[in-house]
């Protein structure tokens, strides 16, 4: 199943900030990084403010990484408004 999601410039930035540490962590642990790598390239290639189609697996991966980023920022006492907005789009 796929869903169309509109990504703003801020959404793209937050997604890439969340996916990059996940990618490097998985790579350091020796796990398969094909799916996160492909998703990073897909998001980076998208024009801002356009709808894009994402698979269920891609959406799950985005939710996990954005939630990790949000929790990390909450722990540091930083704002999480952009991450919260994106999480709402992904549910």
Segment roles from a protein language model:
Residues 1-91:
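Positively charged, low-complexity terminal tracts
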């Amino acid at each position: 199943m796929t869903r169309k999601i509109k990504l703003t410039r801020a959404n793209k930035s937050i997604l890439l900030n969340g996916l990059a540490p996940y990618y490097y962590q998985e790579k350091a642990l020796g796990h398969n990084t094909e799916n996160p790598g492909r998703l990073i390239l897909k998001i980076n290639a998208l024009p801002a403010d356009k709808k894009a189609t994402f698979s269920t697996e891609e959406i799950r991966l985005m939710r996990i990484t954005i939630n990790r980023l949000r929790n990390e920022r909450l722990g540091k006492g930083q704002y999480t408004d952009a991450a919260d907005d994106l999480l709402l789009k992904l549910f």
